[in-house]
Swiss-Prot record:
Belongs to the universal ribosomal protein uL5 family. One of its GO terms (molecular function) is tRNA binding. The keyword Ribosomal protein applies. It comes from the Bacteria. InterPro entries: Ribosomal_uL5, Ribosomal_uL5_bac-type, Ribosomal_uL5_C, Ribosomal_uL5_CS, Ribosomal_uL5_dom_sf, Ribosomal_uL5_N. NCBIfam families: PRK00010.1. PANTHER family: 60S RIBOSOMAL PROTEIN L11-RELATED. The gene is rplE. This is one of the proteins that bind and probably mediate the attachment of the 5S RNA into the large ribosomal subunit, where it forms part of the central protuberance. In the 70S ribosome it contacts protein S13 of the 30S subunit (bridge B1b), connecting the 2 subunits; this bridge is implicated in subunit movement. Contacts the P site tRNA; the 5S rRNA and some of its associated proteins might help stabilize positioning of ribosome-bound tRNAs. One of its GO terms (cellular component) is ribosome. This is Large ribosomal subunit protein uL5.
């Protein structure tokens, strides 16, 4: 079964973007390459169980086992030593990526309190979009009763677009609710 969002991309977004930016070929149309979810767990330095719980929640949200990230450098101010596990990340591609994006846009983001759309300033100049989520409770897979601590996560949507404008149009076409 093809994903709803992927069908929408092929049938609606590609023709609309081709018309707007005059691409010579369908392959030139920007597409979503991957989505990276990152959860930095700063208090994992003192308590390793926190990282396990964060990784388990990230696995529930993404449907994929997260990679444990380790500190690159030692920072005395943060009581951090090189090689200590301090976070978890997941890279989603293909079907899972479209499923996650669909779920994020249609279910999770509307559950954010006082939500007025995602900021339009979070593009990096290369066509990628970064979004910070303050609490993991907006995702339907997370059971409210099982949560010991509210954790946020970063969501980076990497596209093949060359400019922010192309990327914005692509994400808008896929249903991303940008703030007016």
């Amino acid at each position: 079964m093809a994903n709803r969002l992927k069908e929408k991309y092929t049938n609606e977004v590609v023709p609309a973007l081709t018309e707007k930016f005059n691409y010579s070929s369908v392959m030139a149309v920007p597409k979503v390459e991957k989505i990276v979810l990152n959860m930095g767990v700063g208090d994992a330095v003192s308590n390793a169980k926190n990282l396990e719980k964060a990784a388990a929640e990230l696995a529930l949200i993404s449907g994929q086992k997260p990679l444990i990230t380790k500190a690159k450098k030692s920072i005395a101010g943060f009581r951090l030593r090189e090689g200590v596990a301090i976070g978890a990340k997941v890279t989603l591609r293909g079907e899972r990526m479209y499923e996650f994006l669909d779920k994020l846009v249609s279910v999770s983001l509307p559950r954010v309190r006082d939500f007025h759309g995602v900021p339009t300033k979070s593009f990096d100049g290369r066509g990628n979009y970064t979004l910070g989520v303050k609490e993991q409770l907006i995702f339907p897979e997370i059971n409210f009763d099982d949560v010991d601590k509210v954790r946020g996560l970063d969501i980076v949507i990497v596209t093949t677009a060359n400019t922010d404008e192309e990327s914005r149009e692509l994400l808008k076409g896929l249903g991303m609710p940008f703030a007016k």
